[in-house]
Amino acid sequence: LTDATAEKHDSFVGRGEMGSIIEIFSGEVLVQQEPDASSFPSGGIRNTFEARGYTAWDVSSPAFIVGNTLCIPTVFVSYTGEALDYKTPLLRSLAVLDKAAVDVCHLFDKDVKKVIATLGWEQEYFLIDEALYYARPDLMLADRTLMGHPSSKDQQLSDHYFGSIPDRVKAFMKEFEFEAYKLGIPVKTRHNEVAPNQFECAPVFEEANLAVDHNQLIMDVMRRVARKHKFRVLF
């Protein structure tokens, strides 16, 4: 529940005959695993043995490869079934929306079987030079400007909007877009935004659950690529 991606890595290592080590990956492991959730706040209402969390394969979102790691999108729920992530309530709401929309469609066409929600997100972000970032404790601690001049409002800097993209920023954009394409994220648009050092990227719209996964994933990619270009990215 950090508004960012989370991950748990498991190897394919298993025990073979006579104690030997083999690579194995079963369907049972793919469908559900039991990571520890005891470190999450519970208000003291749970015993430690009841503080388990379960990951379950989200088959509606495709797996992808990062480096040499196979990444499998999952939901994360508690021992008693409460959502410990934002994907679980999203999937539940999409299912409810599908059912309600199909009922409405049946008033006009009885052959409608399913309604798929799509989403076309756009990700705005600020790029801060690494040296300037480390000079600001508010940025380092909160990723927000908590002191200094008030932010620009009322479009005073509209000349920056849709203006020429600086070469250093363009190099960053090209690299993170290339990495995004390798992960199947269909990035289509990039441009300056209205505030100083503010920019935007946007993909082709997709099925809502997949679009949200891609949005979270591209922010993770942008953070990694920004460091290579001596930037820090703020969302």
Feature names for model-found ranges:
Residues 2-6, 11:
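Short linear motifs in low-complexity or flexible loops
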Residues 12-235:
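Glycine-rich, acidic/polar active-site loops that bind/position phosphate-bearing ligands
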